A protein has these predicted regions:
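Short alpha-beta junction capping motif
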Residues: 48, 108-153
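Surface-exposed patches in mature extracellular/periplasmic domains of secreted proteins
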Residues: 92-102, 144-149, 167-175
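Positively charged n-region of N-terminal signal peptides that target proteins for export
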Residues: 1-6
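Bacterial N-terminal signal peptides
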Residues: 8-19
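Non-catalytic interaction surface on structured domains
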Residues: 87-91, 99-102, 107, 124-132, ...
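Aromatic-Pro/Gly-enriched surface loop or interdomain linker
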Residues: 21-113, 117-120, 231-266
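Stable alpha-helical elements in mature extracytoplasmic
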Residues: 78, 82, 128-131, 152-160, ...
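An acidic, glycine-rich "communication" segment
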Residues: 27-32, 56-63, 152-233, 237-238, ...
Length: 266
């Protein structure tokens, strides 16, 4: 099934949305794609920014390029396909192509919203951890996705403690604005990876129950939003695949748009 046809079903299910006006925290830079092409002078209100991070086993997983690391799963299709949905569902002027940033680069501070995937073995040296901490405390918002089960949680938290050794992780509840800032997500579901097509299971390893967790700053703002035992990136990437259930992609789009709204207004 063609992408547009499949996405239309998802977007019609979601329905019309309110205008997303005045969301930008900073004036974004002119578009510069990793492929060296794109709109020249147009400026955007939002960019999907992906964190390229080092790991304990692979370093940056191909630091000189844009392939090979756990950070690049679903890349770039998930990022771009999600932004196609954002373009259709909102009036937000989003960049059509994603940005990729490293914790070593000052570029990170130009992009107040970041997504990271496969974070179970991420690892930061002291300077990188300091920069990540500074980014988040200055108003940055980080979404982490696709880590499953008790062992991966502990491994993920080892990296998280390098950034915030003293801040606690809390379970987010239905009272949190994150779940209501645009879409009311009172009934949340576990979004599985693509393996669901073959296994019929929404979970991986021992990660049977989905969790939405977070780390807050001193004002109560969520700085890090954690989708534990779920994989919304796969739902974005495979929204055009008729074998992947539409209910998962529909929820993933709504949750992702709420992430944008929350991150850019808090």
């Amino acid at each position: 099934m063609k992408l547009l046809t499949r996405l239309l079903g998802v977007l019609l299910f979601l329905g019309a949305t309110s205008s997303l006006l005045a969301l930008q925290r900073n004036a974004f830079q002119n578009y510069r794609s990793e492929y060296g092409s794109g709109p020249g002078d147009e400026r955007y209100e939002f960019s999907f920014t992906r964190l390229r991070f080092p790991t304990r086993t692979r370093g940056f997983g191909g630091f000189g390029g844009f392939r090979g690391g756990g950070w690049s799963e679903d890349y770039p299709k998930a990022d771009r396909q999600f932004m196609e949905g954002v373009d259709r569902l909102t009036r937000l002027n989003g960049r059509p192509v994603q940005e990729v940033v490293d914790p070593d680069s000052d570029e990170m501070f130009n992009w107040p919203w970041m997504y990271a995937v496969n974070v179970s073995d991420w690892d930061f040296n002291p300077e990188q951890a300091k920069r990540m901490r500074e980014y988040l405390l200055k108003g940055g918002f980080l979404i982490v996705d696709s880590f499953h089960g008790a062992a991966e949680w502990e491994s993920f938290m080892a990296g998280m403690r390098e950034i915030f050794p003293d801040r606690s992780v809390e379970e987010l509840t239905n009272k949190d604005e994150l779940f209501h800032v645009l879409y009311d997500l009172d009934e949340r579901i576990q979004v599985p990876g693509y393996q669901y097509i073959w296994t019929g299971k929404t979970y991986e390893r021992d990660g049977i129950d989905p969790h939405w967790r977070g780390i807050r700053d001193d004002t109560g703002r969520i700085m890090v939003a954690m989708g534990y035992n779920q994989h919304i990136g796969d739902a974005w990437e495979h929204a055009d695949d008729p074998r992947y259930p539409e209910r998962f992609s529909s929820f993933a789009y709504r949750l992702g748009i709420n992430y944008i709204m929350y991150g850019m207004t808090h």
